[in-house]
């Protein structure tokens, strides 16, 4: 298995496809996700990836497995101490190969190098494998930190 990670802002079309698959998967689990994505200005995010995920404060990575786009992950600045992990997604046919772990390790390393003290994330209870993975890396549950309208959202933090 040949795995490589590339900076995703230059791979807009591939990122757009992965983000679309990710949001479709979420909406299949809970239709109210659509409203949440609108609140996040999702369409603008896709048009201007650099604004949210650009260097020096953010990151967006595209993971390839055997030369095929397999997944993605983003990191965005909240403030000088806090950043947020976003859009972790591994395509179904690539799951079970520890690729999500590979991406999380990359983002944690990058967050430390940038100088952040904590990584935050929000997730949903119908993603138990993701929650388990986050906990494996040391994320723990916290109080709400954003305006996510999903009543069931779970908020997590990793101390760097």
Question: Where are the predicted features?
Answer:
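Conserved N-terminal entry element of GNAT/NAT acetyltransferase domains
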Residues: 1-17, 21, 160
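Conserved GNAT-fold acetyl-CoA-binding loop/helix
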Residues: 6, 20-49
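A short helix-loop-beta-strand connector motif used in the catalytic cores of GNAT acetyltransferases and
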Residues: 45-62
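Conserved beta-strand in the GNAT
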Residues: 62, 68-76, 84
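Active-site acidic-Proline motif in GNAT/NAT acetyltransferases
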Residues: 77, 91-97, 125-126
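Conserved acetyl-CoA-binding loop-helix of GNAT-fold acetyltransferases
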Residues: 90, 96-109, 132-136
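C-terminal "cap" of GNAT-fold acetyltransferases
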Residues: 117-137, 141-160
């Amino acid at each position: 298995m040949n795995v490589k990670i590339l900076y995703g802002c230059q791979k807009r079309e591939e990122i757009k496809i992965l983000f679309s698959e990710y949001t479709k998967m979420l909406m299949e689990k809970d239709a109210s996700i659509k409203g949440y994505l609108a609140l996040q200005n999702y369409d603008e995010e896709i048009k201007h990836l650099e604004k949210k995920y650009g260097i020096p404060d953010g990151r967006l990575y595209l993971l390839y497995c055997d030369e095929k786009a397999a997944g993605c992950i983003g990191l965005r600045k909240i403030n000088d101490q806090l950043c947020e992990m976003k859009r972790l997604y591994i395509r179904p046919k690539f799951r079970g190969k520890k690729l999500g772990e590979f991406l999380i390790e990359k983002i944690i390393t990058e967050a430390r190098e940038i100088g952040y003290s904590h990584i935050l994330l929000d997730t949903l209870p119908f993603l138990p494998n993701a929650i388990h993975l986050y906990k494996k890396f040391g994320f723990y549950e916290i109080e709400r930190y954003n305006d996510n309208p999903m009543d069931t959202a779970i908020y997590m933090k990793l101390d760097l």
